């Protein structure tokens, strides 16, 4: 009984509420915290997507290389439509059908194809067919231009054949699927009918093989090795300007500060590591251990020679990746090229970059040596941007 009375006394002696200022503010001070309005909050910077993040930033950005990619985008519809229409019967297409081919023709999804067609009145025209449907095709002026392009293809056939031979000589098994050559034909200036018209004319150079273990894929195989072709652009340049080639690439040796090397000593040390380079036509190159220095030299040489064989001395990521098996390339090709800024310039975004051979371009951003096909393309682009033919243009 005394225990119960004692417990009751203790309970009554405690206050129901603690009105101590200290305890009150320590337990319920949340109302004093002022909420910062959203517009004044420091925004966390979002990580930029590789799809939009540019490879180069100031001061390394070279505007004339970046502008070339803008030109590619500007004439995307023209180039894709030209290639697609050229393969159609009578080189015409019904407008209703064209509206469903945004990927093949290169116009934005959800947009009217007619709007893109009307941008190039000297190149493309629409007309109402006897079926009362609107069709479009090339203008008579464009037909004449295409005949000129065919002449270029015939005149340069020998050079294009040598380009393909060199690509085959660089490849690991001296074989390249015909589909890959076709997908990249514009890169090297190969005609549309290269497989069916050109290849059969050169049985002493090429052989078409059906690879059963690869779903019957048709592959172009090298018949004979030609030592006169197995000379890279770098090797030719070395004979003209040895010092320039020595400076083209850099494979630095890691060393501690204890060596106390000055700039000249470090340059000489790095040169020992950089030279000799490995020829892209080395038959042992594809067999090198992937992660050795010699293998990286070989892959850098492969990319350099690959670009030197292209019309514009440049290639997009999808062009290079398509040949990764043939040229023993790794997933680190992007990082490898970034390490060689003296020779290569990577333009565009991290997801869709284009690599240029810097020495092939002048300070004005123009190719120093232009292939006739490149000259034709530039003329076509000028006509494509005209609304009517100007007098004396092109004379």
Where are the regions a protein language model picked out?
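C-terminal structured domains
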Residues: 264-300, 305-395
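Charged low-complexity interaction tracts in eukaryotic proteins
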Residues: 57, 112-159, 202-241, 341-369
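Short amphipathic alpha-helical interaction segments
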Residues: 107-118, 189-200, 329-339
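N-terminal chloroplast transit peptides
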Residues: 1-44
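General structural concept
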Residues: 78-132
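Short acidic, hydrophobic short linear motifs in intrinsically disordered regions
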Residues: 79-80, 88-103, 136, 172-187, ...
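Positively charged, polyanion-binding regions of nucleic-acid-associated proteins
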Residues: 72-90, 155-173, 285-311
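Long all-alpha helical scaffold domains
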Residues: 147-285
């Amino acid at each position: 009984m005394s225990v119960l009375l004692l417990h009751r006394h203790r309970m009554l002696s405690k206050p129901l509420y603690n009105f101590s200022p200290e305890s009150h503010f320590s337990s319920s001070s949340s109302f004093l915290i002022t909420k910062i309005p959203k517009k004044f909050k420091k925004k966390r910077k979002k990580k930029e997507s590789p799809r939009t993040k540019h490879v180069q930033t100031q001061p390394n950005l070279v505007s004339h290389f970046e502008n070339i990619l803008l030109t590619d985008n500007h004439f995307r519809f023209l180039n894709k439509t030209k290639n697609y229409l050229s393969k159609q019967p009578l080189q015409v297409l019904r407008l209703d059908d064209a509206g469903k081919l945004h990927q093949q023709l290169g116009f934005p999804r959800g947009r009217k194809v007619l709007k893109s067609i009307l941008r190039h009145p000297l190149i493309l025209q629409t007309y109402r067919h006897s079926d009362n449907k609107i069709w479009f095709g090339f203008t008579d002026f464009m037909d004449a231009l295409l005949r000129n392009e065919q002449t270029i293809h015939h005149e340069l056939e020998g050079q294009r054949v040598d380009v393909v031979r060199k690509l085959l000589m660089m490849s690991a098994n001296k074989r390249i699927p015909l589909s890959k050559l076709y997908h990249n034909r514009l890169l090297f200036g190969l005609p549309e009918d290269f497989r069916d018209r050109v290849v059969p004319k050169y049985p002493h150079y090429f052989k078409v093989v059906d690879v059963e273990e690869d779903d019957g894929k048709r592959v172009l195989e090298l018949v004979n090795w030609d030592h006169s072709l197995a000379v890279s652009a770098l090797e030719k340049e070395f004979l003209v300007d040895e010092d320039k080639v020595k400076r083209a690439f850099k494979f630095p040796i890691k060393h501690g500060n204890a060596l106390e090397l000055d700039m000249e000593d470090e340059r000489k040390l790095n040169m020992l590591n950089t030279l000799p380079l490995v020829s892209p036509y080395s038959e042992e190159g594809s067999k090198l251990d992937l992660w050795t220095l010699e293998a990286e030299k070989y892959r850098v040489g492969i990319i350099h020679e690959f670009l030197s064989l292209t019309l514009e001395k440049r290639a997009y990521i999808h062009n290079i990746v398509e040949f990764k098996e043939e040229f023993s390339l790794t997933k680190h090709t992007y990082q490898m090229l970034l390490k060689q800024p003296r020779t290569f310039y990577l333009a565009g975004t991290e997801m869709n970059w284009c690599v240029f051979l810097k020495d092939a371009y002048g300070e004005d951003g123009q190719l120093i040596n232009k292939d006739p096909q490149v000259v034709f393309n530039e003329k076509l682009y000028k006509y494509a941007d005209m609304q009517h033919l100007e007098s004396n243009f092109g004379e």
